[in-house]
Curated annotation (Swiss-Prot):
Gene source species: Trieres chinensis (Marine centric diatom)
Gene3D superfamilies per record: plastocyanin oxidoreductase (1.10.287.980), Single helix bin (1.20.5.510)
Classification lineage: Eukaryota, Sar, Stramenopiles, Ochrophyta, Bacillariophyta
Alphabetized UniProt keyword annotations: Chloroplast, Electron transport, Membrane, Photosynthesis, Plastid, Thylakoid, Transmembrane, Transmembrane helix, Transport
One term under GO cellular component: chloroplast thylakoid membrane
Transmembrane segments: 36-56, 95-115, 131-151
Family: Belongs to the cytochrome b family. PetD subfamily.
Predominant localisation class: plastid
UniProt GO molecular function: electron transporter, transferring electrons within cytochrome b6/f complex of photosystem II activity; electron transporter, transferring electrons within the cyclic electron transport pathway of photosynthesis activity; ubiquinol-cytochrome-c reductase activity
Identification of the protein by name: Cytochrome b6-f complex subunit 4
Domain of life: Eukaryota
SUPFAM superfamilies associated with the record: a domain/subunit of cytochrome bc1 complex (Ubiquinol-cytochrome c reductase) (SSF81648)
Annotated membrane topology: Multi-pass membrane protein
Annotated compartments: Plastid, Chloroplast thylakoid membrane
């Protein structure tokens, strides 16, 4: 707050302008032209310069170049699809896999009804919701790691 110039409300000129509904820009730093004409274009041009400079000076590849004559043995999806990919891959029936994936939002919808007497926002005071979140998180991580392994180790992760 020390940077902003505070109005002097004992000034009779300012009090007269404020009484008429004017004088709101009598104090402080005006947005025009200081911010809109000078600061904003500098920030925008600086952002463009950083993006273009990084693109020219340090280009990155998106992975291995595509080879139309050599198809990989197993095509993996993006990392955020690993749990559902592994679930569909491990379950023998595809309908069972789709129903298992539909069970996730259905389970999340039922949590507030199970815990409807508890109105707290603190997660430590909502044990059922916290338990559902923790179990779901660890299950998703487990299935995600298993998606990168061969199908015989996809569920056990090679531990047993």
């Amino acid at each position: 707050m020390s940077v902003i110039k505070k109005p002097d409300l004992t000034d009779p000129k300012l009090r007269a302008k404020l009484a008429k509904g004017m004088g709101h820009n009598y104090y402080g730093e005006p947005a025009w032209p200081n911010d809109l004409l000078y600061v904003f274009p500098v920030c925008i041009l600086g952002t463009f310069a950083c993006c273009i400079g990084l693109a020219v000076m340090a280009p990155t590849q998106m992975g291995e170049p595509a080879d139309p004559f050599n198809t990989p043995l197993e095509i993996l999806p993006e990392w955020y699809f690993f749990p559902t990919f592994n679930l569909l891959r491990v379950l023998p029936n595809k309908l069972l896999g789709v129903l298992a994936m539909a069970r996730v939002p259905a389970g999340l919808i039922t949590v507030p009804f199970i815990e409807n007497v508890n109105k707290f926002q603190n997660p430590f005071r909502r044990p059922i919701a916290s338990l559902v979140f923790i179990l779901g998180f660890f299950t998703a991580v487990w299935l995600g790691i298993g998606a990168c392994l061969p199908i015989d180790k996809a569920v056990s992760l090679g531990f047993w």
